[in-house]
């Protein structure tokens, strides 16, 4: 019995190690006026039936007063189709925004608004932008707002994504690999630079 338990434990450890080694991880530094204020870790993990993308960020920003901003995202594809996504955006440990979508569910939710029917025309999401250049994609499904948003080719290997509230992100690629994201917001601009 002890031998069986030991062999089972070793097999579980080997399985976990195989999963970790198959994940693709990319890291970005978050800069505000060339000062390092945080980091982003994005991961793409193949599953038996598709792919899971995760992204976590942590930033310490001074906007009127010091704020710790954390975000997390999990997006899942099954057989190439978007099946679920969940996001959370926290400022000083208080939930500022969150969203949730599950394929087949009648309702989607973006905090703090009421639930709604989620309709989309594309399988491309912001999480995929960390790992793939969106060549020929006119829209990107933005998990935080659960809407398709316009993506425009703004130069060679450069794309501009416009959100419903008119916020803008600029994505810059080199040889198909994301190098930087320029984030334009009302009170500040940030740069996510590949680490």
What kind of region is each of these model predictions?
Residues 1, 22-24:
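Absolute protein N-terminus
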Residues 1-8:
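Bacterial N-terminal signal peptides that target proteins for export
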Residues 21, 38-42, 49-53, 63-68, ...:
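Generic detector of short, locally flexible boundary/turn motifs and exposed helical patches
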Residues 24-100, 176:
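N-terminal mature ectodomain segment of secretory-pathway/periplasmic proteins
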Residues 83-195:
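Solvent-exposed helix/loop surface patches that form functional interfaces
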């Amino acid at each position: 019995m002890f031998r069986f338990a030991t062999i089972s434990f070793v097999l579980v450890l080997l399985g976990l190690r195989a999963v970790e080694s198959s994940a693709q991880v990319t890291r970005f530094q978050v800069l505000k006026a060339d000062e390092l204020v945080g980091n982003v870790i994005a991961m793409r993990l193949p599953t038996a039936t598709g792919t899971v993308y995760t992204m976590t960020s942590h930033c310490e920003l001074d906007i009127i007063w010091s704020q710790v901003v954390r975000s997390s995202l999990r997006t899942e594809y099954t057989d190439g189709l978007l099946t679920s996504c969940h996001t959370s955006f926290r400022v000083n440990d208080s939930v500022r925004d969150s969203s949730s979508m599950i394929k087949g569910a009648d309702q989607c939710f973006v905090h703090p608004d009421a639930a709604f029917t989620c309709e989309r025309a594309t399988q491309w999401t912001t999480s995929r932008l960390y790992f793939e250049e969106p060549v020929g994609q006119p829209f990107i499904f933005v998990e935080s707002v659960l809407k398709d948003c316009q993506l425009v080719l703004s130069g060679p290997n450069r794309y501009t994504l416009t959100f419903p509230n008119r916020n803008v992100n600029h994505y810059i690629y080199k040889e198909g690999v994301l190098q930087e994201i320029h984030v334009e917001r009302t009170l500040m601009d940030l740069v996510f630079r590949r680490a």
